Amino acid sequence: MRKTKIVCTIGPASESEEMIEKLINAGMNVARLNFSHGSHEEHKGRIDTIRKVAKRLDKIVAILLDTKGPEIRTHNMKDGIIELERGNEVIVSMNEVEGTPEKFSVTYENLINDVQVGSYILLDDGLIELQVKDIDHAKKEVKCDILNSGELKNKKGVNLPGVRVSLPGITEKDAEDIRFGIKENVDFIAASFVRRPSDVLEIREILEEQKANISVFPKIENQEGIDNIAEILEVSDGLMVARGDMGVEIPPEKVPMVQKDLIRQCNKLGKPVITATQMLDSMQRNPRATRAEASDVANAIYDGTDAVMLSGETAAGLYPEEAVKTMRNIAVSAEAAQDYKKLLSDRTKLVETSLVNAIGISVAHTALNLNVKAIVAATESGSTARTISKYRPHSDIIAVTPSEETARQCSIVWGVQPVVKKGRKSTDALLNNAVATAVETGRVSNGDLIIITAGVPTGETGTTNMMKIHLVGDEIANGQGIGRGSVVGTTLVAETVKDLEGKDLSDKVIVTNSIDETFVPYVEKALGLITEENGITSPSAIVGLEKGIPTVVGVEKAVKNISNNMLVTIDAAQGKIFEGYANVL
């Protein structure tokens, strides 16, 4: 199972039912909607299509709303484009004007108060660089030297590297978009241009007003956000490393190390992190990724990212399906090359000790040492699954939850396959439900060793405190269990006591109709006892209880239906007999 999740931006190239189905089948886990473009009506159409196709395919696909954010842009230019030439001067005005090579204006009126002489102003993703030469507060104009030539079109982005700006956390448009997202029950909000914790709290305030359970992932795109990352993460559910604007706001050569540090801090807290922007950028035009792009994706996975994101590749590119397949193949290959033993050791040192983390560490170590097929996390809120994912186990993580909302929010978490399963909330019912669901996914089958982890008492968020080891097998018989032990052994069917004489019973489970005092010396040497006679006061029950031997009585036609030399598990607590090694310890 691929562990790294894939986020795809849905746009004109991918909004049809046919293409969304192809993206889901290729590996899309989360659909991103970029609210810098498009109307609410357009986005609603995309949301409806995504959910319709996901339901038809019986797949869980989450939806991420990416806000436009409090960005700075230029106003319109004369004839839609102007030419700025190196060595010339240009005035940046705070009052809206039609742009010319001598003067243009920006949407952010306080820019004049934030910059100083010597500050740099970058236009159009850094393609044009200006340096502030003079500031005229009376005219609300900033005179700049043009450091390199280029064409400037309408409404291009403006970046102020190294400058602390006083932009609001979210704009009115963002607030309207978030309320729309709440109405449409989106799963994640990616908040653009977050600089400080208060920016995230402004979004949380809107969510709390509407009682909406939506995860907030700030996008770190500037130096101020990088500087405040610890405080930002404290109030966030996850993070997006948005390398596009970040590579303009800070020197490009620093981006790789910043990426590693941001991912590491998320890993330490167990919060999901998405690495985004230009990951397979050439696939907007070409059917194959470059070698550098393949290395970029793989290295983000080695850094510890939970998810990798496609932007223009799927929104407007010529090869959206191929881009997702390429991303999937790179992820699978990178994951296969991981040293999971070293990864677990590194994560154990990285993450702070707590009760919940102790369970996560125990599960991950046990899964590694026993080479378990899957870890089944029974979870209400997704917390259990995230706790396990934090330690990057090699085993698949199957998150069994009664909540569709929780399942979708687990879609972004590394290594987690969410499954919606309703069920009773007693501990026994929860365990049985978890095992049955794991088998239904096709990830585990009879004879596979799995770990079940959950919180007890059930139904309470954030109480992960239980781990059980379980070997999957078919139930072949049941009756009344004596004691609470469990045992695995090979059956020896005895119609009379003579069938036991001279036999090594040290690894045997005796199967018989009933017993008397002549059986007792042999039963004492056996691992377990299965009989047809009924009742807790029957000789079989009394002997089993006195000798402390896992026993099941009242098993109909046990002698006839249970074969000799069959490996079975007796679960006395439940009065069940399983074929194979299916012990719950």
UniProtKB/Swiss-Prot annotation:
Mg(2+) binds at E221, D245. The record marks K219 as: Transition state stabilizer. ATP binds at N34, F35, S36, H37, R73, K156. GO terms for molecular function: ATP binding; kinase activity; magnesium ion binding; potassium ion binding; pyruvate kinase activity. Pathway: Carbohydrate degradation; glycolysis; pyruvate from D-glyceraldehyde 3-phosphate: step 5/5. Keywords: ATP-binding, Glycolysis, Kinase, Magnesium, Metal-binding, Nucleotide-binding, Potassium, Pyruvate, Transferase. GO terms for biological process: glycolytic process. Its cofactor is Mg(2+); K(+). Gene3D superfamilies: Phosphoenolpyruvate-binding domains, Phosphohistidine domain, PK beta-barrel domain-like, Pyruvate kinase, C-terminal domain. Its EC number is 2.7.1.40. It catalyses: pyruvate + ATP = phosphoenolpyruvate + ADP + H(+). K(+) binds at N34, S36, D66, T67. Belongs to the pyruvate kinase family. In the C-terminal section; belongs to the PEP-utilizing enzyme family. This is Pyruvate kinase. It comes from Staphylococcus aureus (strain NCTC 8325 / PS 47). The lineage of its organism: Bacteria, Bacillati, Bacillota, Bacilli, Bacillales.
